Structures are given as structure tokens and as C-alpha cells.
Regions:
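Feature recognizes metal-dependent phosphohydrolase scaffolds
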Residues: 1-447
């Protein structure tokens, strides 16, 4: 983020991982618990404690006390990167991981009850557990839990935080809300980002646009709002900004909308029917882990569907493209980033090492200049050697569209702005020549 803030011209289309951090910065407990759970899961202690100065000692003490005899084997962190400044014993990290995960499930259950409009009742699972038998019922089928140790859960009231958990969350909230470094980065995301962006005739967004099974724009209902396509995206953008800059609830609950965008079934940043976090931890049967993508991902192979989305955003040029990310493109399995006969490109950046084994590459960059549109395919970076050297590979560049004539500044968004300013100056000059403005004889003094 510090590097991005030094760039002279940058814009960001918020993704689900962005908004959950943005929500956490407001003090929103569902977002805070998700952010911590994910980063502990991937052993990102350097970023949390050294980078942002988030105080994890209370969580470590709590986890060590509550889960001291629990091996927490299904909560062992993924050791993709080593922590140089703040190494944490994997066993302790696993206990911290489980502790915050249980807090998350409790807090989310409370918020699901508070927001029936989110339609997330199927994600309330703690009350579906038979704690004596160590089983859970999901969609009419019973499963044995592979981890049955729940020392902080009251079977009669499973979503209630213990006094110790409540105290812990208050301390963690303070680390986010009063975090100058984090808020500097979050404000940068707001100043330079949005749910979507139209630029030079192209449409950029992170994930998807909700569609019906027929490929039409889906009417989305969220609280008092009902709308689709661009209207829905504009509404979400407004609500995300309001939750940070002008919240009604000082306890961070306005940011529940960011939590919804993280995992909601109508979230254009998530794009799936559910987030099966609980099942991945506690149930062996991988069928329960399945997260089904929304109709959008089945329909974007259709050129007409892509063009209807572009048209809804006021983009009708034959060269207009949709550029999105979110979903890793599995090149090694024969998948292609191009959809809708070249009207849409999924260009996940591939920075996350966790996905590179799935994709076989290190993501894409989309290039648009005055003559062509091109796609650059990157190879994973080699490890930095002890002598400070590092091997880099040139990307594979594929031209995907050629302009009929070379574009000029006049054809760009900046050109349109300059044209508008020129027309305004012409109208001003015309009005002056017709005597619509009175000349002032008052002298201006310069001090």
C-alpha cells in the first residue's frame, strides 16, 4: 500500500478482501474477526503486528488459556511465507486461529439475526450442532464433526460471546479503530477506489454483476433498496462510503454492509451462493465445502450478455471491454481469460502465491494504448537469493484487439473533459461579447 500511494496515477476497484479491511477499520466485529482469522491462517503476523501494530497479545493469551490442551490440528496456519520480525509458534498460531474463528461464527450469527434482509440464515450453524454427539445437521443431512472441542460455546445460547471473548473483541476493536497507519491506507482506498470504474470506454470491476439464470440483469433487494446493474453498484458504493465517513451507529454496525459484500449471495464482490468457512474447518466431507458461483459466471461466455452489461453502464463502443478479476484463471486446466468473444477479460493479478499452484501462472496485466489492446501473462517470480539477485521472466504478450485508427487524446476520457471545458469557455466568451456580463471598474489590489 505504501508503494501504491507513491504512484502518480492509480485507481482501485474494491474487492471483497478490500472491503472487509475497510469494514474492520470502522470497528465492525464481523469484519475484524474475518480479517484476523484469514491473516492468522496464512501466517501473516509480520503484517498484522509489525506492519499495522495490531496488538495480538490479548488474543494469544486468551487462546493459550482456553485451548491449552487442544491440538487445533485443523487450524494450523499455511506457512507460505516466513515471518522475519514476528515469528509465532505454529501451535500457538493454531490456537489463536481457532479462538478468533469461534468468535467470528458467534458474531456473524448475531448479525444475521439483526439483518434478515441479508438472507444469510443458512450460515447460522452453531445452533445446528448436537454438542453431545458431536454432529451437525446441514440441509437435512447429519455430519460428524472432526473437531468437537467448543469450551466457549453454550449449547443453549451458542451465539453469545463469553465475557472473556467480549473483552477480547473490545481490545481488538481498539487496535483497528485507533490505527493511524491502517486509516491512512483505508482513506487512500476510498480516495482512489470504488465499486467500479468506467475508463476510456471500458468497464472495470472486481467480481461480477448479479444476473438471472437467463442472463438478464438481476433485480437485487437489500433493505429498502431495489435495483439492478449500475444502479445497484452505485447504491453499494454510496453505502460503503457512508459507513466509513458518516456512520449513524458509532459501534461500527453501519459497516455490516462491508461484511455482507465480503460473503453475501448478492454481493458483486463475492459472486458465490455461500461462504463455507465453518464446513472447511469442521466437516471432512468436501461436498459441504462447495461454494457455487452465481449465474453471471455461466453467462459471460455469451457476447450479448456482456454487451448488455456494457450498455447498462452507458458503454456502446465496439472496442469496449469488461475487465474484472477475483476468479483465478486456471490456465494449466485449459481455461481462458477471454469471455464473450473478447468482450470480457478476467485478469486476476495473481499476486497471491496461494493461487499460483491452481493457475499455473502469476496472473495477467491488461494493456491498452493508442494502437492495441493486449494481455500480458506473467510467470511466478523466483525467490530472492542470498546475494540479493532475483530472476525475472518476460511476460507473454497477446494482442486481443487493434484500433482501426490510432487513438488520440480526443478519443480518451481526458479528451472529453478538455472538449467540455473548451465548450464552456466558448459559451462564456459568447456571453461576454453579447454584454451579458457587467464590467467592473473596481481595481484589484494585490498584497
Amino acid at each position: 500500500m505504501d508503494y501504491l500511494m507513491q504512484c502518480h496515477n492509480i485507481d482501485i476497484q474494491w474487492g471483497n478482501h478490500d472491503v472487509v479491511w475497510m469494514g474492520a477499520a470502522t470497528g465492525n466485529w464481523p469484519c475484524i474477526s474475518n480479517v484476523l482469522r484469514m491473516n492468522i491462517s496464512y501466517n501473516n503476523f509480520d503484517m498484522l503486528e509489525v506492519g499495522y501494530g495490531i496488538n495480538l497479545r490479548p488474543l494469544a493469551s486468551f487462546a493459550n488459556e482456553v485451548y491449552k490442551d487442544d491440538p487445533c490440528e485443523y487450524f494450523m496456519p499455511h506457512l507460505i511465507n516466513e515471518n522475519k520480525y514476528d515469528p509465532v509458534d505454529p501451535m500457538l498460531a493454531a490456537k489463536m486461529h481457532k479462538a478468533i474463528a469461534i468468535c467470528q461464527f458467534k458474531i456473524e450469527g448475531q448479525r444475521i439475526k439483526l439483518h434478515p434482509e441479508y438472507d444469510l440464515k443458512n450460515r447460522m450453524l452453531l445452533d445446528k450442532i448436537d454438542y453431545e454427539k458431536g454432529e451437525i445437521e446441514i440441509r437435512g443431512k447429519r455430519y460428524t464433526l472432526r473437531d468437537r472441542n467448543f469450551p466457549t460455546i453454550d449449547p443453549e445460547n451458542p451465539y453469545e460471546l463469553t465475557s472473556a471473548e467480549e473483552r477480547l473483541m473490545n481490545i481488538l476493536e481498539a487496535s483497528f479503530v485507533n490505527n493511524e497507519k491502517l486509516h491512512t491506507h483505508i482513506k487512500f482506498l476510498y480516495s482512489n477506489g470504488g465499486i467500479y470504474k468506467k475508463v476510456n470506454g471500458n468497464l472495470l470491476y472486481h467480481g461480477c454483476i448479479p444476473l438471472t439464470d437467463e442472463g438478464k440483469l438481476k433485480m437485487c433487494k437489500l433493505g429498502d433498496f431495489v435495483g439492478k446493474g449500475k444502479e445497484y453498484m452505485d447504491y453499494l458504493d454510496k453505502m460503503v462510503r457512508k459507513a466509513y465517513f458518516n456512520p449513524v451507529d458509532k459501534n461500527g454496525r453501519d459497516a455490516d454492509i462491508m461484511w455482507y459484500l465480503w460473503l453475501g449471495k448478492q454481493s458483486p464482490l463475492f459472486g458465490k451462493d455461500q461462504m463455507t468457512t465453518f464446513e472447511r474447518y469442521f466437516i471432512e466431507d468436501k461436498k459441504t465445502h462447495k461454494e457455487h458461483t452465481l449465474a453471471y459466471y455461466k453467462k459471460i461466455d455469451n457476447k450479448e450478455v456482456c454487451e448488455s452489461i456494457l450498455k447498462n453502464f452507458g458503454l456502446t463502443s465496439e472496442h469496449s471491454k469488461i475487465l474484472s478479476g477475483h476468479v483465478p484463471v486456471k490456465i494449466k486446466d485449459g481455461e481462458s481469460p477471454a469471455r464473450g468473444e473478447g468482450r470480457l477479460y478476467i485478469i486476476d493479478g495473481g499476486i497471491s502465491k496461494a493461487y499460483q499452484k491452481q493457475t499455473g501462472i502469476a496472473g495477467y496485466t491488461f494493456i491498452f494504448n493508442s494502437r492495441i489492446m493486449a494481455l500480458a501473462e506473467h510467470k511466478p517470480y523466483s525467490q530472492l537469493q542470498k546475494d540479493g539477485t532475483q530472476k525475472f521472466s518476460s511476460p507473454k504478450v497477446m494482442i486481443v484487439d487493434e484500433m482501426k485508427r490510432r487513438l488520440t487524446i480526443e478519443d480518451t476520457d481526458i479528451g472529453k473533459q478538455l472538449r467540455s471545458k473548451l465548450e464552456n469557455l466558448k459559451r462564456l466568451l459568447k456571453a461576454y461579447r453579447r454584454g451579458y456580463f457587467k464590467e467592473s471598474n473596481e481595481k484589484i489590489r494585490l498584497s
